C-alpha cells in the first residue's frame, strides 16, 4: 500500500502539473506577483477542499464506483447527465487546448532546428497525427511514452528554474501592475491548472477506499503543483518586468509570446532551450493523459469494438472535433483552457458540494466528515457559479482576455 500511496500522490501531481502551468504567466503578466500568489494559494485550498468532499461521499459507496453512478445515486438522472456532459466538455476542451498549444510549439521547434519553415497549421496536423496515433494504439504505448516524457519534463523543469534564478529581480516581484478586471480574468486559467478531480474515482479505487491515506494523497499531491507553480511564477515574473512583458504579449500572442519575452529579456540560449523543451513535454504529457481518458470514455459510450476498425472510429470522434478547434482558432490555447474551466467548475466545485449536501442528509452519522459544515458547502457552490460567470463575462467582452 505504501507504493500505491506514493504512486497516487504522483498521479495527482502529474495530472495537475501540465500545460496549464504554461498559461499562468500569460494570465499573471498584467496582475502582478502578489495578487497571483493570493490566487494560487486560494484556488489550491478550494480545489483540495472539494477533493476531500468527494472523499467524504465515497466512504458510503464501493471504492470502484464511477462519478456518474455516484451522481445518479444522490442527484438523480439530471445530476448524472450534468456530470457526464461536463466530463465530455472538459476533456474535449483540454484536448483542443493541448493540440493548439503543442502544434504551435512543434512548428516553431522544427523551424528553429531544421531551418525548414513550418506553419502552425502544419504543426497542429503533425502533432495530432503522431500523438493521436499513439493513443489509438492503446494504453500500453501511452504508458511507455508517458514514463519517458514525464521523467524528462521534471528534469527540464528543474533545469529551467535553476537557469532563470540569476535573472530574477526583486523589484519585478514587488510591483503591482494591476489592470482593471485582469485579476478576475486570470481566475479561470489558474483554476483549471489545479484540476485533478477527473482522476479522483480512479485513485479512490486504486487505494481501496482507504480514507486516512487518501486524505494525505490529495493534500500532498495537490500541494506539490502549488509549490512548482509558485517557483514558476517567481522565475518568469521576476525575470521580466510587467510593462515589457505586456508589450511583448501584445506583439506575440500565446505561448510563443512567453518564449519571446524570456528570449529577449534573459538573452540565454540555454534558458530558451530549457523552457521550449519543458513546454513541448508538458503539452505532450497533458495531451496523452487527457486524450487517453477521452478515447476510452467515448469507446465505452458508443460501444466501439476493440478492433483496428473500431479504434480508428473512436480515434476519429476523439480527435476530429478538437482538431477543428485548433485549426480555426490557432491562438485559442488560453481561451480553450478558460472554457475548460467552466466544465471543471461544475465537476470540481458544484457537483462535489451538491453530492456532499445530499450524502450528509442520507448518512447523518458519517465516520469521516470534512470541516466547515453547510456554510462551507454553500461557499464552494457559489465559487463554482462565480468561475463560470467570470468566463462568460470574458466571452461577452465585459472582462479583458488574458495572454
Swiss-Prot record:
Catalytic activity line of the entry: L-tyrosine(in) + H(+)(in) = L-tyrosine(out) + H(+)(out)
Compartment annotation: Cell inner membrane
GO biological process, one term: amino acid transmembrane transport
Pfam family, one: Trp_Tyr_perm
Summary of activators and inhibitors of this protein: Inhibited by the uncoupler carbonyl cyanide m-chlorophenylhydrazone (CCCP).
Transmembrane domains' residue ranges: 9-29, 35-55, 81-101, 122-142, 148-168, 184-204, 217-237, 275-295, 308-328, 332-352, 376-396
Membrane topology: Multi-pass membrane protein
Major localisation: membrane
Keywords associated with the record: Amino-acid transport, Cell inner membrane, Cell membrane, Membrane, Symport, Transmembrane, Transmembrane helix, Transport
GO cellular component: plasma membrane
Record topological domains on the Cytoplasmic side: 1-8, 56-80, 143-147, 205-216, 296-307, 353-375
Domain of life: Bacteria
Induction: Repressed by tyrosine and induced by phenylalanine under the control of the regulatory protein TyrR. The promoter region of tyrP contains two adjacent TyrR boxes, which are the targets for the action of TyrR. In the presence of tyrosine and ATP, binding of hexameric TyrR to both TyrR boxes inhibits binding of RNA polymerase (RNAP) to the tyrP promoter and leads to tyrosine-mediated repression of the gene. In the presence of phenylalanine, TyrR binds as a dimer to the upstream box, which enhances the binding of RNAP to the tyrP promoter and leads to phenylalanine-mediated activation.
A GO term for molecular function: transmembrane transporter activity
InterPro entries: Amino_acid_transport_2, Trp/try_permease_CS, Trp_tyr_transpt
Periplasmic topological domain residue ranges: 30-34, 102-121, 169-183, 238-274, 329-331, 397-403
Its biological purpose: Transports tyrosine across the cytoplasmic membrane. The transport system is energized by the proton motive force.
Assigned protein family: Belongs to the amino acid/polyamine transporter 2 family. Mtr/TnaB/TyrP permease subfamily.
Protein name (database record): Tyrosine-specific transport system
